[in-house]
Amino acid sequence: MKISLKVEEAMRVNHGTGGGWAAAPLHLLRKSSLPLLLLSSIFFSPLPARGADDAVVPNEALVLDGLPAVPKALAERATAYMEFRTASFQAWNPLRPEMLVTTRFGDVPQLHRVKAPGAARTQLTFYSERILGARYRPKTADIVFSKDVGGGEWFQLYLREDRTGKVTLLTDGRSRNQGGAFSRDGTWMAYTSTKRTGKNGDIWVMNPSDPAKTDRMVVEGSGENLFVTDWSPDAKTLLVVEGISVNESRQWLVDVASGAKTRFSPESKELVSWGGGRFSPDGKAVYTTTDLDSEFKRLVAVDVATKKMDVLTPGLAWDVQGFALSEDGTKLAWTVNEAGAETLHAMDVRTRKEIPLPKVPYGTIGGLGWSPEARNLGFTLTSAKSPADAWAVDTQTGVLSRWTESETGGLDANAFAEPEIVSWKSFDGKTITGLLYRPPASFAGPRPVIVNIHGGPEGQTQAGFLGRNNFFLNELGVAILYPNVRGSTGYGKTFVKLDNGVLREDSVKDVGALLDWIAAQPSLDKSRVMVTGGSYGGYMTLAAMTHYNDRFRCALDVVGISNWVTFLEHTESYRRDLRRVEYGDERDPKMRAFLERISPLASASKITKPMFIVQGKNDPRVPYTEAEQMVGAIKKNGGPVWYLLAKDEGHGFSKKKNQDFLFLATLKFVEDNLLK
């Protein structure tokens, strides 16, 4: 599955030769390919160690409270579902016909190069922490990549020299740094950093060849909401997006020499979202996405001098999800999110005619990037039948090629279930949709259901690879349903606003309506339903349990918000104001009272069914204290609760050893509480 992510999604644009780099944090631009239920446990590694009593032994970074032993037999049954990996397209090499990808052979994703479709992957980095994204420095084969430590999201930027393999830290090693854009000749790189105050995201410019002498601040920001998306061809101007909320963002032109800002996006009485942009080679136009005068995001070309906007994708009833402009400016590629799956399109900019492309398998497409000669289009494709892999299409011959073929643990991926789009009416007559994965027909009778709610809240569950979750379908006969409740993206900007402010709990009522729908389905067992979700989906899980405790068997909350006030007061300062725009300002007495009232912590006494709460100690978004106060409240009320804390993780688990144990513990939780 795939989850869109907040303000950063508005900046999703890729430069001509790279699919893995943009103005927002690198890892956030490629949406998660698995639901947070199991936190993307998707790559090969041996099973966790087993004790003498045949129980799986957690590693030293995990703290367990209330969890029973996970038996060896359960781990052995699940082995094949853990032994697979994914790969993501990052960029085309400017000098050689090869791809840069991220994949994982050990514990965390690293950089690899691939020289041809199906060729061997050559590993380039060997860190104990994850690589989040990368791109080539123009005109060279040197790579700039992003990395953090322990999931803390204090991203640092590094330069890897192609000739020597030497890696140089470009940033200060302490602040949060988000990769931006290179000038056309590769001399200059602009990026956003909190190094000045630790909170405000300022725009900086450096020459990566000599960062110590050239690094300087260009724009003093306020909060972490400025993202550089491109340089003008003459390297005198930066195109910058200011993200305010998922519904509102602005574009600015910034003079590199003086730092002077000129608004580029037009003033509007309504809230308008503008995505990242890309200058045409002559600097006379900017290609971008916007929902100005539209319910959905469209691909447009804006004249720099006159601000006249030319809509390139008229008549769409879906969002343009991402796009890429070739280096020479002759070709555009874009994806359209059609009911949770993406279609791929390309255009000859000179004629404005679409380029015929082969049909891409049903799923999600991300990280678009043109090869230097503007012939091959690289991207990451995820489908129900395949993990994320790097693909390319030759726009001259129409040949679609798969550059990586990630392993699936020896399982027959063609047998994995495809999603079915389902819909139901909510309390106010609004139609809510979701994706339902059914177990094989060999499982007789009404089936148990896991309801998995995405994060965001401005996100969407899209068709993709279920990964480990296929175990629930194929081995346990459990159906999985992913609702896109109100507030989700992908269904128009009006739908996104339906849960704002005091309407927050209307999205929880959508879950109640879903329970009514499940009860009316002969193939589903209304008496055996579990709810789960991560981040905002974790809040939804806790809220659903306080409202519908009697209708759920159990629940799994992953890095979820338990109290809106304490969350807003303790989320990292660089993101606090952005979250207040979405959820409300807790400093206002009336809003504070409302947020306290709807917080799951205030109604924890209503939760009597088994709960499993999972958290990363280094989470900068949802502090670990949100989990611990909820665990404490449930215990105080005599409720059954399991608690798993990872001391070396942040907002979700990224290390394979931790993912392994979480998956196995989740299986134990499901068998003990949903299936019995």
Can you name each region flagged by the protein language model?
Residues 53-86, 114-130, 160-176, 196-198, ...:
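Multi-bladed beta-propeller domains
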